[in-house]
């Protein structure tokens, strides 16, 4: 059984600064990290490996220069995957979800897999599209919002998905793609032994040409800015007489 778990490198939000002059966001000092939602996907894949015993977990990502960071690679591999595959190109920095999905699908097809697991969304965009688009590109079943994996055999996967007023139990044939929610598990913190062992695990670096993509479409970011702060109107009504109560009610009506 070969399981691919996809992840995205995103800027660490605590390092993002706001320029006071125009409200634009400054990412220059922001380190990259694994998207929080993808940590659940990695954990889910590694838990399945422990249950099955003979499974292989491959971490996979497409992106730009952030994927060249040795510390970032070690962070991923220390969380349990046996191998890492990264597809690197500068244009993937600003790739739209459908282009990211196309690249992931091509890389997964080249690598071979039985099950592909990704997070429900990414910490930066949270478009919640990539998992389903990968399934569409590969023409295989895909389910999003998975909150629990009930069983996995050589041919079938059974999962639970929580909706607003009900819980679905779904069975799909393999190969398949699932996007997991944060409810599925609590990602573990890697041990020192796992961190040291991560440096010995294999890493494959591919280009778009290696997976059969001649060009990578991307969008051009014009500006990323924080929303303008609005001044809050503070109305203080002193006293508890009828006039004050009437004024209080009138102000509430204006808000509603």
UniProtKB/Swiss-Prot annotation:
Q: Which UniProt keyword terms apply here?
A: Electron transport, Transport
Entry's PANTHER family? ELECTRON TRANSFER FLAVOPROTEIN BETA-SUBUNIT (PTHR21294), PROTEIN FIXA (PTHR21294:SF17)
Which pathway is this protein assigned to? Amine and polyamine metabolism; carnitine metabolism
Residue stretches in coiled coil: none
Write down the NCBIfam families for this protein, in alphabetical order: PRK03359.1 (NF002888)
Q: What task does this protein carry out? A: Required for anaerobic carnitine reduction. May bring reductant to CaiA.
Give the gene that encodes this protein.
Answer: fixA
The record's note on quaternary structure and interaction partners says: Heterodimer of FixA and FixB.
Which domain of life, per UniProt? Bacteria
Query: Acyltransferase as a keyword?
Result: no
Q: SMART domains per the record?
A: ETF
Organism the protein comes from: Salmonella dublin (strain CT_02021853)
The UniProt entry, under SUPFAM superfamilies, shows: Adenine nucleotide alpha hydrolases-like
Q: Name one Pfam family in it.
A: ETF
Entry protein name: Protein FixA
Family listed: Belongs to the ETF beta-subunit/FixA family.
- GO BP, one annotated term: carnitine metabolic process
| Entry keyword annotation includes Transferase | no
What is a GO molecular function of this protein? electron transfer activity
């Amino acid at each position: 059984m070969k399981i691919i778990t996809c992840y995205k490198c995103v800027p660490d939000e605590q390092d993002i600064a706001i320029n006071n002059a125009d409200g634009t966001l400054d990412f220059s000092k922001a380190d990259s990290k694994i998207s929080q939602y993808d940590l659940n996907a990695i954990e889910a894949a590694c838990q399945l490996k422990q249950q099955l015993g003979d499974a292989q977990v491959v971490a996979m990502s497409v992106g730009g220069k952030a994927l060249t960071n040795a510390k970032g690679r070690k962070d991923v591999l220390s969380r349990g995957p046996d191998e890492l595959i990264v597809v690197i190109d500068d244009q993937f920095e600003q790739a739209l979800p459908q282009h990211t999905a196309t690249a992931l699908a091509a890389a997964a097809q080249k690598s071979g897999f039985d099950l592909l697991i990704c997070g429900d969304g990414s910490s930066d965009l949270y478009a919640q599209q990539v998992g389903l688009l990968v399934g569409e590109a590969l023409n295989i079943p895909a389910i999003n919002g998975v909150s629990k994996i009930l069983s996995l055999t050589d041919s079938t996967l059974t999962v639970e998905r929580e909706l607003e007023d009900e819980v679905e139990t779904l069975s799909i044939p393999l190969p398949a793609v699932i996007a997991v929610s944060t409810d599925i598990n609590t990602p573990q913190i890697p041990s020192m032994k796992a961190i040291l062992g991560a440096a010995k695990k294999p890493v494959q670096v591919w280009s778009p040409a290696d997976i059969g993509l001649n060009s990578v479409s991307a969008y051009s970011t014009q500006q990323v800015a924080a929303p303008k702060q609005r001044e809050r109107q503070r109305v203080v009504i002193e006293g508890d007489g009828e006039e004050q109560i009437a004024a209080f009610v009138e102000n509430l009506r204006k808000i509603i």
